[in-house]
């Protein structure tokens, strides 16, 4: 099986690395060559660390990197068996990508989206192969996180679901079957909890460090909600909350004003060096 991953950012590169380590030939595509090069260089750096720590041999690393190629040409999807989209979490962007892929890819090619909250059914409507469109939601950092949410759209076929479930297992993941709903399972439960932590901070209930300490030692969480939001990216948290609020129309999903304020200030968490904590 040949796989294309669209997007060489953190999630895309993680998917590329995981697929290549599982033995698949992978091509990563992004809109600029510098993005592609940066993504592949990041994979190389992470694998080098694994070699240094004795987790893999130099020969194994070379074999993995040999299965990875990069391009800016969307036409490279023509001979792929699966395309996994890991682009921006914006519906119009995803629909445009899937419409283009539908015109390029061979009829039997499966088109998967790594969307964290958007409708697979709506994305699939941009194509003429809705039965072969599916959600394949990985979690960051992809090489380490075992879960993949496999999301059925309204028209996703059983054959498509079975193929992606089997692939997820071959990639060393534990797939869970999701019938499409806003936020799926993890983000529907997780992101509102993070959002509530932000309300606690905004309302002066406790400071950021104490909020996180409370959830780590009081609820057994490995990471506090505000540090976790910083790791996910506050812009991503905001988009997910906006999606939940829009789809459900329930005030409990209203994004915290402090979250929106921080995103406007480009304080997005770890990736910008500052969020609820400094990095």
From Swiss-Prot:
The superkingdom listed in its UniProt entry is Bacteria
The signal peptide, as residue positions, is none
* Pathway assignment: Lipid metabolism; butanoate metabolism
Enzyme Commission number: 1.1.1.35
What protein name is recorded for this chain?
A: 3-hydroxybutyryl-CoA dehydrogenase
According to its UniProt entry, the function of this protein is described as: Involved in syntrophic growth of S.wolfei with butyrate, as part of the butyrate oxidation pathway. Probably catalyzes the oxidation of 3-hydroxybutyryl-CoA to acetoacetyl-CoA.
Which GO cellular component terms, listed alphabetically, does the Swiss-Prot or TrEMBL entry include?
Answer: cytoplasm
UniProt record, GO biological process? butyrate metabolic process; fatty acid beta-oxidation
Query: So what family is this one in?
Result: Belongs to the 3-hydroxyacyl-CoA dehydrogenase family.
Concerning NCBIfam families, the annotation shows: PRK05808.1 (NF004474)
The conditions that induce or repress this protein are given as: Highly expressed during syntrophic growth with butyrate (at protein level). Seems to be constitutively expressed.
Source organism: Syntrophomonas wolfei subsp. wolfei (strain DSM 2245B / Goettingen)
What is the catalytic activity of this protein? 3-hydroxybutanoyl-CoA + NAD(+) = acetoacetyl-CoA + NADH + H(+); a (3S)-3-hydroxyacyl-CoA + NAD(+) = a 3-oxoacyl-CoA + NADH + H(+)
Report the subcellular localization: Cytoplasm
List keywords of the entry alphabetically.
Answer: Cytoplasm, Fatty acid metabolism, Lipid metabolism, NAD, Oxidoreductase
Q: Which GO terms describe its molecular function?
A: 3-hydroxyacyl-CoA dehydrogenase activity; 3-hydroxybutyryl-CoA dehydrogenase activity; NAD+ binding
The record ties this protein, via Pfam families, to: 3HCDH, 3HCDH_N
């Amino acid at each position: 099986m040949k796989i294309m991953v669209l997007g060489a950012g953190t999630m895309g590169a993680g998917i590329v690395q995981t697929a290549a380590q599982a033995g698949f030939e992978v091509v990563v595509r992004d809109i600029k060559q510098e993005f592609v090069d940066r993504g592949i260089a990041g994979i190389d750096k992470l694998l080098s660390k694994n070699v240094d720590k004795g987790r893999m041999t130099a020969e194994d690393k070379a074999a993995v990197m040999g299965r990875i190629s990069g391009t800016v040409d969307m036409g490279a999807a023509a001979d792929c068996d699966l395309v996994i989209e890991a682009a921006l979490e914006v519906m119009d962007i995803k629909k445009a990508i899937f419409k283009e892929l539908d015109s390029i890819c061979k009829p039997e090619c499966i088109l998967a989206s790594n969307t964290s909250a958007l409708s697979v059914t709506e994305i699939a409507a941009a194509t003429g192969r809705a039965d072969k469109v599916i959600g394949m939601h990985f979690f960051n950092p992809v090489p380490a996180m075992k879960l993949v949410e496999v999301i059925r759209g309204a028209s996703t076929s059983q054959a498509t679901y079975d193929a992606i479930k089997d692939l997820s297992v071959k990639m060393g993941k534990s797939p869970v079957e999701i019938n499409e709903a806003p936020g799926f399972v993890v983000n529907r439960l997780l992101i509102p909890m993070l959002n509530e932590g932000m309300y606690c901070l905004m309302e002066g209930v406790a400071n950021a460090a104490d909020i996180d300490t409370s959830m780590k030692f009081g609820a057994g969480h490995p990471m506090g909600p505000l540090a976790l939001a910083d790791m996910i990216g506050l812009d991503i948290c905001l988009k997910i909350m906006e999606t939940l609020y829009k789809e459900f129309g329930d005030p409990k999903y209203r994004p915290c004003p402090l979250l929106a304020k921080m995103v406007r200030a480009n304080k997005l968490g770890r990736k910008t060096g500052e969020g609820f904590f400094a990095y």
